[in-house]
Amino acid sequence: MALAPPITEIEQLKAHPALGRLLEWNTAAVQAVKFDRDELTIWVAKEAICEACLALRDAAECPFNYLCDITCVDWNPSEPRFEVVYHLLSIPHKERVRLKVRLGGDSPAVESVTSVWPSANFYEREVFDLFGVRFAGHPNLKRILMPDDWEGHPLRKDYPVEGYR
């Protein structure tokens, strides 16, 4: 059986609880959407990520009350180079959504969501440690996996295979 093609039109996906809530909250913050293999991905403006997470967490009809993970993708040499990815779950409604924020440049930064989900603390530290993404407002942004004196961020595509010497 062939897979259905991805849906990328916002109008076709407005009925999804996460997208509907974000469009109700701030239409301009939603940059793009993709529904593929029963999973919804929403690209959000980096300036609005904290408020978007808060809007989804506090949504009355379908609260996305659990932050499963935060990770990052390095698309080097493309620009914007980085995407920070937030995986959210609505436990009572068994719905999932993925939020993505595009970040450019050699010193990527985005607002921390630790004020929305305290569990974001270690996820953000891991992304900082391995990719070098800074999270503004993070209560304790320091390395979590690599030694404190480690040079660079080893999951960046421009990181030397043999490490810095």
Regions found by a protein language model. Name each.
Residues 1-165:
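Terminal low-complexity/charged segments
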